[in-house]
A protein has these predicted regions:
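Surface-exposed, active-site-proximal loop segments in enzymatic domains
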Residues: 60-74, 252-258
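Active-site-adjacent pocket scaffolds in enzyme catalytic domains
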Residues: 104-233
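Short glycine-enriched loops at secondary-structure junctions
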Residues: 53-59, 245-247
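Active-site and substrate-binding clefts of carbohydrate-active enzymes
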Residues: 208-272
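Hydrophobic faces of well-ordered beta-strands that scaffold small-molecule active sites
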Residues: 20-22, 49-53, 100-104, 124-126, ...
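Generic structural signal for well-ordered alpha-helices
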Residues: 6-10, 35-39, 81-88, 114, ...
Length: 272
């Protein structure tokens, strides 16, 4: 299982003094061997543990299995909370600490999910993907969000410098050229009539003139990621949130790393 490769990853992260947050699903915390690996790293103070909830593999199993219900934000609020609570308690039992960081599976996050995790004592969410909409997958639209950390207000609208209780640390996503917000607005205009039929946004992206980039070794080369980092710094962004799935640690476990050669290439990306 890919989680069994975590010691190799952790050794690399330790070389750079990086303390990662491992966001755990219900199947992981029900696997004694996986928990043993994680507890050893956690006990050494080398990582934090948080919560990553996929509805389809987190009890109670009451909803029909379909694409719509794979987004946590689409479930009834009570069922959302029950799943979150079960996963939260399983992590707390295994690690003797209450997790405070959360990411919704498939980025399925909204105000109701935020309220539910606040009820459970979470202080950090990292479910927002700036300049990205999941509407075609029955998910949320984050196209108006920036990668800048913010605090949710009591009405759960992201506003920076508020003193309310849930911090949003978005995945680091931005553009390689120009002001991020201006690029996002231009992309939005190009997707509407009369421009949408010409697919200008896709053309400009391929030419790297309007390219959106994730800070993720699953999706980008080290050179492209470093270009994004430089853009972030030049625009005053002070925090980076690099993301990837643990399935990338084992060839054949996911769509991004399909072979042992891909696996070795992925680790080289991280080292670079």
């Amino acid at each position: 299982w890919n989680v069994y490769r975590l010691p190799t990853l952790q050794k690399l992260l330790n070389e750079f003094g990086i303390v990662p947050t491992y966001l755990l699903t219900y199947p992981v915390v029900r696997d004694p061997h996986a928990v043993g690996i994680l507890r050893e790293i956690f006990a050494a103070g080398e990582c934090e543990v948080g919560t990553h909830c996929h509805p389809w593999n987190t009890p109670p199993y009451e909803e029909p299995l379909n694409a719509y219900n794979s987004m946590l934000c689409n479930l009834p609020v009570t069922l959302q909370f029950e799943k979150l609570q079960r996963l939260h308690e399983a992590i707390q039992s295994n690690f003797e600490t209450a997790p405070v960081a959360f990411r919704s599976g498939r980025w399925g996050f909204d105000a109701e999910v935020a309220r539910n995790i606040i009820r459970l004592g979470y202080r950090i969410d990292t479910s927002v993907t700036p300049y990205t909409s999941w509407a075609q997958a029955s998910g949320p639209d984050f196209s108006r969000f920036s990668p800048r950390p913010s605090m949710f207000t009591e009405h759960l609208r992201a506003e920076r410098d508020s003193n309310h209780m849930l911090a949003e640390i978005p995945a680091t996503i931005g553009y390689l050229h120009g002001d991020f917000q201006a690029c996002a607005e231009l992309v939005g205009r190009l997707r509407r009539a009369p421009f949408c039929g010409f697919k200008l946004g896709s053309l400009l992206s391929r030419l790297h003139l309007l390219r959106k980039v994730w800070l993720s070794p699953e999706m980008e080369t080290p050179a492209i990621m470093m270009q994004l980092v430089r853009q972030m710094r030049s625009q005053g962004y002070e925090l980076l949130n690099l993301v990837f799935h643990s399935s990338a640690l084992l060839g054949g476990c996911g769509p991004f790393v399909r072979s042992q050669a891909d696996e070795h290439a992925f680790m080289r990306k991280l080292h670079t």
